[in-house]
């Protein structure tokens, strides 16, 4: 038996990647700032918002990872819905805060039984090894969840809780962390700074690098679609 790598022969791997490409539904950004990128680099958000062509487009492998995340989120939502522990549960809830030029999609929005407060659940998938290093929510994930909660608070006038939920791609192990109020303040500050650049028509600064640091191995530069555009 031969292992197929492609070349002149059709492969399922090629068909799968093409299917992902043809069925992927991009969420067009209606605003300059989105929750999914707010905790990252403001300069990259500027490039995305102004339609700058990516100098480092995503590879097919990353789209497979994104799709896997969607599958895990869908399974988790269905099982949570079937648990009977929630008065309400909604999947993929859009949010918009026009005054802050902000929008996004909440993974899951719930009200636990007997609770009056809404809670934002921000889901992140990772392999089981990653759980070894988890000490709390990653800053970019905490800011994302907090920004959605802030948006709901602005809409409803009521306090909204937030939680970052990590799910193992290997065995559905779950680690979950409530998001402290300080992250709400940080998310709001990022929005205010980003909007200040927007008002002034300026491109946000590059993130600083330590001397000798390899930009291709530094988050968030390593996975940035505009790395060459920004760093040259």
For the regions a language model picked out, list residue spans one by one.
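A residue-level signal for conserved active-site and pocket-lining positions in enzyme catalytic cores
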Residues: 41, 148, 224
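Metal-dependent nuclease catalytic cores in nucleic-acid-processing enzymes
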Residues: 74-82, 112, 136-166
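Short amphipathic alpha-helical segments
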Residues: 68-72, 144, 183-186
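A structural signal for short, well-ordered beta-strand segments and their strand-loop junctions
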Residues: 90, 119-122, 161-166
């Amino acid at each position: 038996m031969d292992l197929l790598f492609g070349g002149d022969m059709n492969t399922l791997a090629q068909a799968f990647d093409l299917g992902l490409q043809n069925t992927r539904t991009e969420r067009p950004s209606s605003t300059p700032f989105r929750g999914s990128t707010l905790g990252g680099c403001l300069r990259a958000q500027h490039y995305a918002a102004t339609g700058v062509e990516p100098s480092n487009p995503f590879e097919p492998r990353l789209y497979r990872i994104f799709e896997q995340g969607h599958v895990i989120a869908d399974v988790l939502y269905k099982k949570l819905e079937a648990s009977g522990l929630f008065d309400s549960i909604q999947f993929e809830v859009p949010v918009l805060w026009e005054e802050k030029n902000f929008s996004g999609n909440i993974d899951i929005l719930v009200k636990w039984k007997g609770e009056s407060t809404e809670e934002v659940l921000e889901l992140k998938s990772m392999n089981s090894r990653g759980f070894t290093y988890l000490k709390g929510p990653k800053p970019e994930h905490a800011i994302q969840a907090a920004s959605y909660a802030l948006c709901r608070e602005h809409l409803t006038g009521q306090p909204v809780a937030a939680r970052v939920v990590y799910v193992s791609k290997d065995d559905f192990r779950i680690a979950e962390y409530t998001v402290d109020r300080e992250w709400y303040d940080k998310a709001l500050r990022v929005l205010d700074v980003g909007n200040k650049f927007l008002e002034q028509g300026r491109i946000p600064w590059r993130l600083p690098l330590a001397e000798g640091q390899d930009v291709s191995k530094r988050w968030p530069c390593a996975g940035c679609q505009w790395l060459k555009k920004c760093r040259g």
